[in-house]
């Protein structure tokens, strides 16, 4: 962060169910520095016990504020867990509290070593740059990094049900809340001409007002 700020840039990161993204925004002459930073992040991260202990408490507090003390967020989390019974999509991005309590720095190091690898990453560069320059930088900074053996997650199919599922949860809240969800077609590279996912996306906005 200090290096990026000293060079007039800004940076941030975010995590979703499918990937974690790190990004920088700065003047194009700093592009080589961006590749250097991300190359170091990919394979040279230092994970100390002291830093882990401090940061895991920050994550626990974030979970408490955003989910545990927020009835609506907590309900959505329970809904996802009920809807996806075999898929990782049923797990909260921030993690369950019990997992955060039992996590050790060794768990973090194992995850980092396994998944932070050039054969498990996508590099996106947008702006006034030349493709040849970008490919050369990618080769320079990532080409020499050793790949990892990536564990492919193939969860079993979701169990079929005929009459639906329902679950009632109790939480301190001013008003009751209700969520209903439906399994629906998804956008797939195997069937790019399928229009139904897009129609259902529009329908959801219409029904939501």
Feature-to-residue mapping (PLM):
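Short beta-strands and strand-coil junctions in structured, solvent-facing domains, enriched
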Residues: 44, 48, 131-132, 147-148, ...
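Non-catalytic accessory/assembly modules
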Residues: 50-57, 64, 70-77, 129
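M16/insulysin-pitrilysin zinc metalloprotease superfamily fold
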Residues: 25-56, 194, 206-209
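Hydrophobic face of alpha-helices
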Residues: 1, 35, 53-56, 60, ...
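Solvent-exposed, non-transmembrane alpha-helical starts
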Residues: 32-34, 69, 136, 190-196
């Amino acid at each position: 962060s200090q290096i990026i700020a000293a060079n007039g840039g800004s940076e941030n990161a975010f995590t979703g169910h499918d990937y974690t993204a790190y990004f920088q925004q700065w003047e194009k002459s700093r592009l080589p520095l961006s590749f250097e930073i991300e190359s170091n992040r990919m394979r040279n991260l230092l994970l100390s016990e002291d830093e882990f202990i401090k940061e895991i408490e920050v994550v626990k507090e974030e979970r408490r504020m955003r989910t545990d003390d927020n009835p609506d967020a907590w309900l959505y989390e329970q809904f996802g867990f009920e809807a996806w019974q075999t898929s990782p999509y049923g797990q909260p991005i921030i993690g369950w509290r019990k997992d955060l309590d039992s996590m050790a720095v060794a768990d973090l190091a194992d995850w980092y070593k396994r998944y932070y690898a050039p054969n498990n990453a996508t590099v996106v560069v947008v702006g006034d740059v030349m493709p040849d320059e970008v490919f050369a930088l990618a080769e320079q900074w990532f080409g020499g990094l050793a790949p990892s053996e990536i564990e492919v997650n193939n969860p079993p199919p979701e169990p079929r049900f005929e009459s639906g599922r329902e679950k009632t949860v109790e939480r301190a809240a001013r008003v009751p809340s209700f969520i209903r969800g439906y399994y629906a077609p998804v956008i797939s590279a195997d069937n790019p001409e399928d229009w139904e996912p897009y129609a259902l996306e529009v329908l959801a906005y219409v029904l939501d007002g």
